[in-house]
Amino acid sequence: RHPIDVRFIEFMPMGEGTRWSDSCFWSAPDILDAVKGLVAVAPVEQEQRNGGPARLYTLSGPDGPGLGRLGLISPLSSHFCTSCNRLRITSDGALRTCLFDDREYRLRNALRHPKLGIEAVRRIVTLATRDKPIGARLLERRHNAVAQRRMTAIGG
């Protein structure tokens, strides 16, 4: 009855000491296959997506098409690094250009400094986006954490 989007996010190996195994990993294609066993699934056209990392699908059941959509975010099985357009600012004022890269750019001091202002922030963001990694080499680092900070410390 309501247009609710539901997203499934594959396991993201984040945080110091994270270890994982293929036997405990449920991939986005496996999730999609399970959903296809229940309802009809159709991909959402690119121009109707919100620009995020999720691959979106409409669902139709015996009562007709659903109002919401299914989104699958697949950092491991079908990584989205080359199309990523995201930046994150952590709660302690650091800019991160990639969840899976530990490089951070300090924004807090520039934001708080009365004389630096928006131009200093703009320079930092420009530098950070110029250095944004194209791919995080997730599969090369399999079974180990790819970033030291946990998602709860990064935000997202």
Predicted regions mapped to residue ranges:
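Radical SAM enzyme [4Fe-4S]-AdoMet core and its adjacent flexible, acidic
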Residues: 1-70, 75, 109
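Radical SAM enzyme core and accessory elements
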Residues: 65, 78-156
